[in-house]
Design a protein with these regions (language model features):
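Sec-dependent N-terminal signal peptides
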Residues: 3-12
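Small beta-barrel nucleic-acid-binding modules, primarily SNase/OB-fold domains
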Residues: 15-141
Length: 141
């Protein structure tokens, strides 16, 4: 009985159990965070390897708008860090109440599209430089 109780309790401590998510995007929070529905559950996702302006920072509205136009209401596929992402070995699989994941829309890397749009920066500490577009684009250390 103790084991069952511990297993049930542990399931509520983790934001998600699965590591591979396929679902519809419900809402975009900013240029690197969104909420999706996968397997009947709401999952908050932090896109790994990039950094976009937060609410109250310059560029927030543009970054959130670009991501929203790209994915809101659409089905995306997200792999949580540790499941073969560009951020494996560099990032934790969770951050606060979110999973950290590499996400795709129709097999197109969403993080790459955000950096190409100029609304998000490569964060090489976590991406290994995967999303660096050029020496003149922004880059987080």
């Amino acid at each position: 009985m103790r084991l069952l109780t511990a297993m049930v309790a542990a399931s509520f401590c983790s934001p998600a159990i699965a590591a591979d998510y396929l679902g519809k995007v419900l809402a975009v929070s900013d240029g690197d965070t969104f909420t999706m529905e996968a397997d009947g559950a709401k999952v908050r996702v932090r896109i790994c390897g990039i950094d976009a302006p937060e609410r109250g920072q310059a560029g927030y509205g543009q970054a959130a708008g670009v991501l929203s136009s790209m994915i809101e209401g659409k089905t995306v596929h997200c792999l949580q860090v540790g499941e073969g992402t560009v951020c494996d070995g560099r990032s934790r699989p969770t951050s606060r109440d979110r999973i950290v994941a590499q996400c795709f829309l129709d097999k197109v890397d969403i993080a790459e599209q955000m950096t190409r749009s100029g609304t998000a920066c490569d964060w090489p500490k976590f991406s290994g430089g995967k999303y660096k577009i050029s020496d003149t684009t922004c880059s987080r250390k």
